């Protein structure tokens, strides 16, 4: 499926880049970062002791220079995002094309991960997609902190199927953010029959420098038809690191300063080779120059 497709049908302007605003957990932050040029947002879903999604909250510690405790309820978040991503809605923002849910599953017992996935799918069906009544169109990336919680993904997909909404499977992909072994991640995904719509990240908090060795390894895997179709880096705030990330061939980055990435993409070195992704760019296709 997506992993096998050639993303070369849109070569105008070069590789599409997902400019993902970091830790966007209340309405004010959402509006602020969209105004700064983000085309995607990354938001933190925290869970209660039963593994049910409760609120958008990162918690302490978080990236340097950011407030860690901004929050809103999960259902209020989904409802607001539905409005922002529905053409014709008064609040519609055409540039918001992808929502990455950073699922804080390390606090959830492993045996609850499957039911957590079902619960998140159910709430998205009811509040974001409104069981087919909503025109909300964003692509969704389920970002899992460790491959040890991969059953969350199965639960999510199984719930879409059992509720009769397999069509939303086309809108949903997965990502694993734990900097785990890439080969092992690929093997586990294959064993779970998760074979498409896969992103792979590498990174660390903006407070700490990280070498790009693993990022480049992931990009090499992507380009040799590995399990992932997109590779992104986090959290990237410095202009110099943004440039290095683009030169390495990444498909996007999480940043606290999306306006800086917009500026870098307009620099002479990058403006012909990269561009901000739009809704017409399929996030589940591997880009071929």
From Swiss-Prot:
Expressed by the venom gland. The keyword DNA-binding does not apply. Disulfide bonds join 62-68, 64-207. Its cofactor is Mg(2+). The active site is at residues 22, 58. It is found in: Secreted. GO terms for cellular component: extracellular region. GO terms for molecular function: lyase activity; metal ion binding; phosphoric diester hydrolase activity; toxin activity. It catalyses: an N-(acyl)-sphingosylphosphocholine = an N-(acyl)-sphingosyl-1,3-cyclic phosphate + choline; N-hexanoyl-sphing-4-enine-1-phosphocholine = N-(hexanoyl)-sphing-4-enine-1,3-cyclic phosphate + choline; N-(dodecanoyl)-sphing-4-enine-1-phosphocholine = N-dodecanoyl-sphing-4-enine-1,3-cyclic phosphate + choline; an N-(acyl)-sphingosylphosphoethanolamine = an N-(acyl)-sphingosyl-1,3-cyclic phosphate + ethanolamine. The keyword Repeat does not apply. One of its GO terms (biological process) is killing of cells of another organism. InterPro entries: PLC-like_Pdiesterase_TIM-brl. Belongs to the arthropod phospholipase D family. Class II subfamily. This is Dermonecrotic toxin LarSicTox-betaID1.
């Amino acid at each position: 499926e997506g992993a096998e497709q050639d993303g070369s049908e849109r070569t105008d302007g070069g590789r599409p880049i997902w400019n993902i605003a970091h830790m966007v957990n209340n309405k004010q932050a959402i509006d602020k970062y969209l105004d700064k040029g983000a085309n995607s947002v990354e938001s933190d879903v925290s869970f209660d002791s039963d593994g049910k999604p409760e609120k958008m909250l990162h918690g302490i510690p978080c990236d340097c220079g950011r407030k860690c405790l901004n929050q809103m309820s999960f259902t209020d978040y989904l409802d607001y995002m539905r409005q922002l991503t529905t053409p014709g809605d008064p609040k519609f923002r055409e540039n918001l094309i992808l929502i990455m849910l950073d699922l804080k599953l390390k606090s959830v017992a492993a045996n609850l991960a499957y039911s957590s996935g079902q619960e998140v799918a159910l709430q998205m069906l009811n509040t974001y997609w409104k069981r087919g009544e909503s025109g909300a169109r964003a692509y969704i990336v389920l970002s899992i902190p460790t491959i040890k919680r991969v059953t969350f993904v199965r639960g999510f997909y199984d719930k879409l199927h059992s509720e009769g909404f397999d069509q939303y499977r086309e809108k949903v992909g997965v990502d694993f953010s734990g900097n785990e072994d890439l080969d092992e991640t690929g093997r586990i995904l294959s064993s779970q029959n998760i074979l498409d719509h896969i992103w792979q990240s590498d990174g660390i908090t903006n407070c700490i420098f990280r070498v790009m060795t693993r990022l480049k390894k992931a990009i090499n895997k992507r380009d040799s038809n590995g399990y992932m179709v997109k590779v992104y880096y986090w959290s990237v705030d410095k202009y110099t690191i943004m440039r290095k990330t683009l030169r390495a061939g990444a498909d996007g980055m999480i940043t606290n300063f999306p306006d800086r990435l917009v500026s870098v993409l307009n620099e002479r070195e990058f403006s012909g080779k990269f561009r901000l992704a739009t809704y017409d760019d399929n996030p589940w296709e591997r880009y071929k120059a």
